[in-house]
Design a protein with these regions (language model features):
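Parallel beta-helix/beta-solenoid
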Residues: 58, 66, 79-81, 86, ...
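Cleavable N-terminal signal peptides
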Residues: 12-13, 23
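Right-handed parallel beta-helix/beta-spiral solenoid domain characteristic of secreted/periplasmic
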Residues: 32, 46, 64-73, 82-135, ...
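Surface beta-loop-beta hairpin patches that serve as ligand-binding interfaces in beta-rich domains
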Residues: 417-439, 444, 450-454, 460-507
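Extracellular beta-strand/beta-solenoid scaffold signature
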Residues: 76-79, 102-109, 129-138, 154-163, ...
């Protein structure tokens, strides 16, 4: 008899080791037709979020809300509800369509659970001006979190937020009609966020936080106090128009106070601000070793691409803006330019702006403001402008190997000089030794001013801004090491020999 008991215990231990804790995982169903005294099975579901919050969940468990139905309250999960790397805790919908979590004046879900997946749900708040105090999705101080395929709207404090999250993913998030921001990530009281991936998201019409009278609000996607992050294939538009203050303002997609941030293959258009900014993309104060590449910006009230050092920020250094396109940005704010470099404090230096294509019939190609910034180099760009090439009050960066041409029917001037030749002779810009390396010539660009694309997944199909077969920009740029290896459309770019000028390598 003793031998049988020992074998029975051994078989249980072996089963647990082989199958892991997920062997004990359960699916918990929540339905508007349920009852919280039920066991939470599909046939006998729970009814409320309160029951969910009163339950401790195990790795591999699923919390399933009935699709097409609305559930009032805030889902609250903590570290005791965490999954494991192999058996994640999942919060999602079941049946037809998505379930809606109505956070009312509070939040939709607040979680500190690691190894968590939240997907296929709608989160709605009372409205940024109708009593909402919360956030749609707030994940904090945990790791290995996935947010996918959600719609979040009506939250004053923001749509979807990572705070102190390590190894987090947000994909296919539609954030709209929120206050402070559509999507954001940053530090908690305990730690920075790190190793983040934000992709295939849309931030639309997040106008501003009516209660924030001291700082920017109405951002599309913003991350700060983050190390190692990629934002790609996202669209941000019509954000920031109702920020309730003047001063520093929102941006479509941007990052600040971090390291190794890449923003690529994104579109930012028609973003606004009643104060400053309101631009497309921004690498902001305290950022190092970060890149804006392969993006499209157009019709933003602020600059399409902004490099900015705010007061008291940490060092801003070794940042790159390359192979992007800007069309008619800077329509209202800052120095009314496509690209803007601004230093309100020391510590900003050593940044590269190369192989971008700029078309601006409404303002300048590039502007410089605030303090002088050492080590700013502008190479291999195409500037098609309807007036002044350069505006602003501070010392200029170094221009080399760029092509300049006026918008049809306009006259282009150069930092107060009437002609390109006068500018070069007076300033030494566009010269390496005694050789003039810049050109005042029609760059041969296809359909300038005609970009209207809104789907980042289709950027490779953009017809406008390619080079014509006879373009003088083909193979005439200055070699740049570690140039990313590709152009805006995915064509290979040489590393050691002459690339083309602008965002397009080949017709």
């Amino acid at each position: 008899m003793l031998l049988i008991k020992k074998l029975f215990v051994l078989s249980i231990v072996t089963f647990s080791l082989f199958f892991g804790t997920s062997a004990l995982a359960r699916d918990y169903y929540v339905s508007t037709a349920g009852d919280d005294t039920n066991p939470g099975t599909e046939n006998k579901p729970w009814k409320s979020i309160e029951k969910v919050n009163a339950t401790d969940f195990e790795p591999g468990d699923k919390i399933l809300f009935q699709g097409g139905k609305t559930f009032a309250g805030t889902i609250k999960l903590d570290e005791n509800d965490s999954g494991t790397k192999e058996s994640k805790l999942i919060v999602t919908s079941y049946g037809q369509g998505r379930a809606t979590i109505d956070g009312g004046s509070s939040s939709g879900i607040v979680a500190g659970s690691s190894h968590l997946v939240v997907k296929n749900l709608n989160f709605v708040g009372a409205g940024r001006k109708n009593g909402s105090e919360g956030t749609g999705v707030l994940i904090r101080d945990c790791e290995d979190v996935e947010i996918d395929n959600i719609d979040v709207s009506g939250f004053r404090a923001g749509g979807a937020i990572f705070s102190g999250v390590h190894n987090g993913r947000m994909t296919n998030v539609y954030a709209h009609e929120n206050g402070a921001t559509g999507i954001s990530a940053g530090a908690s009281e305990k730690r920075w966020s790190e190793n983040l991936y934000i992709a295939y998201c849309v931030a639309e019409n997040n106008p501003g936080d009516p209660c924030n009278l001291t700082n920017h609000s109405g951002n599309g996607i913003v991350i700060g106090s983050v190390s190692n992050a990629v934002i790609e294939f996202c669209e941000a538009f019509n954000n920031g128009w109702d920020m309730p203050r003047e001063g520093n303002g929102p941006v479509g997609i941007w990052a600040w106070n971090g390291n190794n941030i890449i923003i690529q293959f994104c579109i930012a258009h028609d973003n606004k601000s009643p104060g400053h900014d309101g631009g497309g993309f921004d690498l902001d104060g305290g950022l190092t070793n970060s890149i804006l590449q392969y993006n499209l910006s157009y019709n933003n009230e602020g600059p399409g691409y902004f490099l900015c050092q705010y007061p008291t920020a940490s060092v801003f250094k070794n940042n790159i803006v390359r192979y992007n396109i800007s069309q008619n940005d800077g329509t209202k704010n800052n120095r009314k330019s496509a690209i803007d470099v601004f230093a309100a404090d020391v510590g900003m230096s050593d940044c590269e702006i190369y192989n971008n294509t700029v078309y601006n019939s409404k303002g300048a190609g590039i502007a410089f403001g605030g303090l002088d910034v050492p080590g700013i180099v502008i190479r291999n760009n195409i500037f098609i402008c309807g007036g002044e090439l350069i505006t602003g009050e501070s010392k200029r960066g170094r221009f080399e190997g760029n092509v300049y041409w006026p918008v049809e029917g306009c006259t282009m001037t150069f930092d107060g000089y009437k002609t390109f030749d006068e500018w070069v002779a007076a300033t030494g810009q566009e010269k390496i030794g005694d050789t003039v390396v810049g050109k005042y010539i029609d760059p041969g660009v296809v359909n300038p001013g005609m970009a209207t694309l809104t789907d980042p997944k289709k950027l490779a199909d953009l017809k406008a801004y390619r080079l014509k077969a006879d373009s003088p920009c083909i193979g005439e740029g200055l070699p740049i090491d570690n140039n990313g290896g590709r152009d805006f459309w995915g064509n290979k770019v040489p590393d050691k020999c002459k690339p083309s000028i602008g965002a397009c390598q080949v017709p």
